[in-house]
């Protein structure tokens, strides 16, 4: 099975290549914090030899509570992304929520992300595809892995095959998510790169009444399980003070644990991808 290669600058993204990190913070809390977080990611990934793309959101449009922090908005967020790109010479990924956001965001960011909750919204999918940008498609919590072929088809029909799939857990009753490890292999059969969003897979949606809870203590175990499947990359959020983060702190990695965490995953990825394929069908 031939695996499609997606190129972002000088980074090659494919299921059979060394894993790429989409990493950063959940939402842009401030310019200074974004620069601090990116600086640490750059230091660690350069040391470990992991290709890196900075991730953050300018607007969290699907917060549980109307009182929850959403972010600085698109205009201010894009200014911060431009500064991060200039300062650290790294690509940037962010999510869009409305068709009108697609073109201006794609002019600044190297990858635009389709949120899981919106992944079946055809008008949004088509608007994203028509930018020609690389698209990271989050698998909705309510979709089976094999159903992702329909979203891929919408993008291709609109003229864009620069696509990445991303697992972020499946609904398991109320306020819980689980990750089906068999789903990775199903999505890899589409030949597009597959990522694992370990951070959001640790959520307990609505678990704190007016916001999502999380299981940060299990991030290493779940990340190792996912990356053992031979994936194109990992999606990760970290924060210097997760307990006081403005969004999804309960499932964010502590920033000071980033290096030992990624060092183990780098070793695991190298090992898994050194194995010859064993055909068992």
Swiss-Prot record:
Transmembrane stretches, start-end: none
Catalytic reaction(s) noted: D-arabinose 5-phosphate + phosphoenolpyruvate + H2O = 3-deoxy-alpha-D-manno-2-octulosonate-8-phosphate + phosphate
Keyword entries, A-Z: Cytoplasm, Lipopolysaccharide biosynthesis, Transferase
GO cellular component annotations of the record: cytoplasm
InterPro entries in alphabetical order: Aldolase_TIM, DAHP1/KDSA, KDO8P_synthase
Superkingdom field: Bacteria
EC number: 2.5.1.55
Coiled coil: none
Keyword Membrane carried by entry: no
GO BP field: keto-3-deoxy-D-manno-octulosonic acid biosynthetic process
GO terms of molecular function: 3-deoxy-8-phosphooctulonate synthase activity
Family annotation (Gene3D superfamilies): Aldolase class I
Subcellular localization, as worded in the UniProt entry: Cytoplasm
Keyword presence, Nucleus: no
Pathway annotation from the record: Carbohydrate biosynthesis; 3-deoxy-D-manno-octulosonate biosynthesis; 3-deoxy-D-manno-octulosonate from D-ribulose 5-phosphate: step 2/3; Bacterial outer membrane biogenesis; lipopolysaccharide biosynthesis
Family recorded in the similarity comment: Belongs to the KdsA family.
HAMAP family for the chain: KDO8P_synth
Name of the protein this chain belongs to: 2-dehydro-3-deoxyphosphooctonate aldolase
Gene this chain is encoded by: kdsA
């Amino acid at each position: 099975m031939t695996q499609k290669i997606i190129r972002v600058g000088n980074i090659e993204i494919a299921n059979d290549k060394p894993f790429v990190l989409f990493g950063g913070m959940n939402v842009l809390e401030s310019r200074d914090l974004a620069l601090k977080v990116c600086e640490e990611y750059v230091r660690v990934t350069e040391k470990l030899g992991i290709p890196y793309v900075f991730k953050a959101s300018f607007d969290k449009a699907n917060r549980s509570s109307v009182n929850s922090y959403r972010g600085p908005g698109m205009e201010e967020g894009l200014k911060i992304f431009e500064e991060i790109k200039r300062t650290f010479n790294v690509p940037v990924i962010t999510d869009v929520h409305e068709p009108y956001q697609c073109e201006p965001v794609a002019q600044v960011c190297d990858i635009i992300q389709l949120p899981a909750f919106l992944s079946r919204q055809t008008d949004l999918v088509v608007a994203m595809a028509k930018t020609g940008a690389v698209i990271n498609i989050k698998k909705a919590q309510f979709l089976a892995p094999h159903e992702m072929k329909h979203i891929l088809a919408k993008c291709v029909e609109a003229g864009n095959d620069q696509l990445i799939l991303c697992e972020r857990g499946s609904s398991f009753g109320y306020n819980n998510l689980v990750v089906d490890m068999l789903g990775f292999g199903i999505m890899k059969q589409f030949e597009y790169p597959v990522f694992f969003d370990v951070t959001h897979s640790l959520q307990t949606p609505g678990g704190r009444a007016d916001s999502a809870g999380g299981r940060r203590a299990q991030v290493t175990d779940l990340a190792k399980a996912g990356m053992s499947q031979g994936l194109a990359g990992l999606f990760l959020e970290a924060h210097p003070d997760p307990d006081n983060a403005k969004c999804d702190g309960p499932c964010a990695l502590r920033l000071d644990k980033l290096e030992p965490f990624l060092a183990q995953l780098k070793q695991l990825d190298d090992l898994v991808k050194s194995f010859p394929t064993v055909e068992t069908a």
